[in-house]
Amino acid sequence: QYTPEACRIDLRPLARRAGARFIEARVSGLTSSPAEVHLSDGSALSYDLLSLDVGSEVDDRALQPLGPRLWPLKPLDVFHERWQTLLQSPPEAVPRRLAVVGGGAAGVEAVLAASAAWRQRGRTLSCVLVTGPRGVLPDHSPAVRAHVQAALSMHRIECLPHRAVGTPDGLLLDDGRHHPADLVLAAAGARAPSWLRDTPLALDARGFVAVNAHHQSTSHPNVFAVGDVCSRVDQTVARSGVHAVRAGPVLAHNLGAWLSGQPLHTYHPRRWSLYLLSTGSRQAVLSWGPFSAAGTWVWRLKDHIDRGFMARFGSPSVSPSPPSPPSAPPSAASGPHA
């Protein structure tokens, strides 16, 4: 429903406006003495004050035996390129049995978008969503789950409330059944970046950076972190994009305050977050605490909010493409909004 360009934010002009130097590279590690961030090209950056917002990885370790049949949704650019190549392949070369592992928002949107892409191209695709024992969207209200389940049922997408491990030709479910699959999309949970294990930073039990209410490292006061890469030690905060966005102004203040010796601010997560989940064909489901709704008007609301967010950062036009088959599961561009 959107072009890839409309879903990207170009960081270069943002960095120029802020007077910052932009470096495109992957982090491979960091040290505190000397205080350096190490990059995958072998170079290092010295720091006095460090802010981490590098996100998380898809936890697909149990699915690794699938080999080339396993496609994690992250990194999104890699996934998108593979998906586009797949859509352009001749009918005899495309999968007929798709499984998506993950019962959260990303898994739901991915399986519905994939189903729509095949359906609108006149192709047959058998889709299943493997959710784990808690089922679809376990942290949302029963009404939201019912809306999503109705959308899945309408498109004949089977839900399997089981844990699964990968095999060379499909998935082995925790009830002993084997589910064959030509392609498996991994959207199951977040895993901390592996390089964090070798740093001096205090981590939680799952390997994420432990931070206090100011989003400051509990072990290194000159290191801050927001988003999926960190875990609050004072309360449980869901790994949701909305918190990375809303913590931004607090982080900006705290970085300046730390440098000038001023008091730090606390990030107070809202009790409820607004989720707008695309279910295909310009339909969407709204979830806000105990409240829910579904329909075209929800998609229009989502579209309006997403366009506004992208426009704030000088993105190219985010007008929807002309009505055409979906080009990729939109999981990375959807989810929490406020």
What do the predicted segments below correspond to?
Residues V229-T279:
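A conserved FAD-binding loop/helix module that cradles the flavin
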Residues Q1-T3, L112-H162:
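Rossmann-like dinucleotide-binding cores of NAD(P)H-dependent redox enzymes
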Residues W83-L125:
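Rossmann-like NAD(P)H-binding beta-loop-alpha module
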Residues G207-F224, Y267-H268, S281-F291, V298:
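FAD-binding beta-loop-beta segment adjacent to the flavin cofactor pocket
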Residues R17-A99, L185:
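FAD-binding core/adjacent interface of flavoenzyme oxidoreductases
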